[in-house]
């Protein structure tokens, strides 16, 4: 059996600090932004020329903190630690001193902070989009739409911690019910790490109530 090595061209920097709470697929949270820090020697401006003409790109990345298991899902439990995501390209940031690419600004990513990236390719609508495609077992899934609520105190605290864009992204993530499908306990308090903070909440009768926001590094 031949082993193949992949070169890391960059790392993801975002507010998702753990797997719990990351969107189940890319493109589900338009407000959530991420940054790919491009490493030398792959940061040469010539390599990215023309990429800004594309609205979306493909990312090939590493499930560096995942386990291994099955093929018939899009979950991180796979025999090869590779993930594939289509994301919106918002901007390309250049280093003013040397003209090299510092990184890419994205939205709609479903990737953990610190994840290695192996490759970037433009999304081609005329070949990559298939409106007639069937989704197998996912065709019967209902996308959760919870009502997200904050107390006045929590809302005020969030405004001192996060930008308005980060708050909207947090609402989008929570509205999609970040819990695993097997966890549905009305009296349980759940927690997820977001932007360096522990966001705790309860869910009952379709309402997600954020009850606490505390620093993850007291």
For each feature predicted by the language model, list its residue ranges.
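Flexible glycine-rich active-site/ligand-binding loops centered on an Asp-His dyad
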Residues: 102-138
């Amino acid at each position: 059996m031949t082993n193949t090595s992949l070169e890391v061209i960059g790392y993801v920097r975002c507010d998702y600090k753990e797997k719990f709470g990351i969107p189940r697929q890319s493109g589900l949270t338009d407000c959530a932004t991420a940054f790919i820090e491009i490493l030398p020697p792959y940061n040469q401006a010539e390599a990215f020329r023309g990429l800004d003409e594309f609205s979306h790109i493909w990312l090939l990345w590493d499930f560096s903190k995942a386990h291994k298991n099955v093929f018939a899902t899009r979950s991180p439990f796979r025999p090869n630690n590779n993930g594939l995501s289509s994301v919106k390209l918002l901007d390309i940031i250049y280093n003013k001193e040397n003209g090299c690419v510092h990184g890419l600004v994205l939205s709609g990513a479903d990737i953990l902070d610190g994840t290695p990236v192996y490759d970037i390719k433009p999304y081609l609508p005329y070949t990559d989009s298939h409106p007639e495609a069937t989704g197998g077992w996912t065709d019967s899934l209902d996308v959760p739409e919870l009502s997200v609520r904050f107390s006045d105190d929590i809302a005020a605290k969030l405004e001192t911690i996060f930008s308005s864009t980060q708050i909207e992204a947090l609402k989008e993530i929570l509205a999609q019910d970040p819990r695993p499908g097997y966890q549905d306990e009305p009296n349980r308090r759940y927690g997820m790490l977001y932007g360096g903070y522990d966001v705790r909440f309860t869910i009952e009768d379709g309402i997600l109530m954020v009850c606490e926001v505390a620093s993850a590094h007291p």
